Amino acid sequence: MTDTNVNIIRLTAAEIAAKVASGELTAVQVTEAHLARIDAVDEKVHAFLHVDREGALAQARAVDEKRERGEKLGPLAGVPLALKDIFTTEGIPTTVGSKILEGWIPPYDATLTKKLKAADVVILGKTNMDEFAMGSSTENSAYGPTGNPWDLSRIPGGSGGGSSAALASFEAPLAIGTDTGGSIRQPAAVTGTVGVKPTYGAVSRYGMVAFSSSLDQGGPCARTVLDAALLHEVIAGHDPLDSTSIDAPVPPVVEAARNGSVEGMRVGVVKQFRGEGYQAGVLQRFDESVALLKELGAEIVELDCPSFDLALSAYYLIAPSECSSNLARFDGLRYGVRVGDDGTRSAEEVTALTREAGFGDEVKRRIMLGTYALSSGYYDAYYGSAQKVRTLITRDFEKSFEQVDVIVSPTTPTTAFPIGERADDPMAMYLADLCTIPTNLAGNAAMSLPCGLAPEDNLPVGLQIIAPALKDDRLYKVGAAVEAAFVEKWGHPLIEEAPSL
């Protein structure tokens, strides 16, 4: 790579947008630099499933032409982005990391995809993910695992590991993820990047392939808090095409990110978010973050949320139940792969053969779990009980937010584990989402940002900030203050310590 390209890929999204708007850089230059980076390192990282070289350069040229004509540019015009392969993209494959949709090219754009294009963001391609967003390591992708740029033998988190790895390897300054139980935040934590799960319903799900409809939420991924806020503002907003979309103004997230402060804020620490299964180095960095918040003028309040201990169990009944219903549409008859259709078999047989060949083990496991939990005679004992626990978790959050403005916790109990280490132990894998799942069940907003490297393995640790529903701006206000204090303490952003690959 040329020195110019190296300099370009190291810029933040905000810096790129400013340089493109002023004419110091062209959008084509920026896009070419990132495509060159993908060519140089993605064979090792495997962040992308599909790179849309021609489409990205065409979008970039359109931005440059718009600028030459003196037309107004969007706040992220010309900034490249890596899109999780769960959002439909007209004319570009959308696989959701599954064999069952191999080669499927959607005839329409998701609302989120449309918003990105309307904002002049340059979509580089589609990123790898756990199949149908089910997993915490991106090992469940039908197209092979993604490596963590900090150590390629380790996982980049999941389900959105391709998006977080693209950021940490400087293949893109922005990415999109989705978060059902932690799939934006946990990858951000283990790759030293920033990930935000907005309030449920804040970002349209139209054109996003559904896993668990009452939990799924798209959101921004970036390397800085301000970049995440700029992307959040672009993708959020009411959409009449999504029945769960919130008809409320987007909170002032960019303003909050530009004015970070915790002075006088009450910050809650939940006693349930530590103990067995937490790596010592993760807790050490978390405790240092709490001390830092105190130094910055926050009041620390201890919270007790007993229902959080049941969150994981409730989640693994609710999410599979909704998945078993949502994934019934993948029958091999309407779109995607079709197996065994030789003219001798019935539609039922073709569907059974297609699903057997098309779905991976984890997806089959969750479909079976969910079908069982919803079956006659078991519904109240399983799905019904889990929904009651969900109500208790929501109440614990409501009680907590009467006493505090935000809650902080470790994002995930450990740093990135080696690829393959938990592949045969679903329960160990599920524990990666211990701290993130309660937020999905309650529908409020949360962010993960880097808070240092764990002393044991020199790998990134994430700090999670949780805010009440529709108060997403608090995440950015606190996140920006913490980020600035850490950068001052370290002398540089943490991501600069990542290997150059």
From Swiss-Prot:
HAMAP family: GatA
Annotated GO biological process: translation
GO cellular component, one term: glutamyl-tRNA(Gln) amidotransferase complex
EC category: ligase
Entry EC number(s): 6.3.5.7
Matching Pfam families: Amidase (PF01425)
Source organism of this protein record: Streptomyces avermitilis (strain ATCC 31267 / DSM 46492 / JCM 5070 / NBRC 14893 / NCIMB 12804 / NRRL 8165 / MA-4680)
Family indicated by similarity: Belongs to the amidase family. GatA subfamily.
Protein name: Glutamyl-tRNA(Gln) amidotransferase subunit A
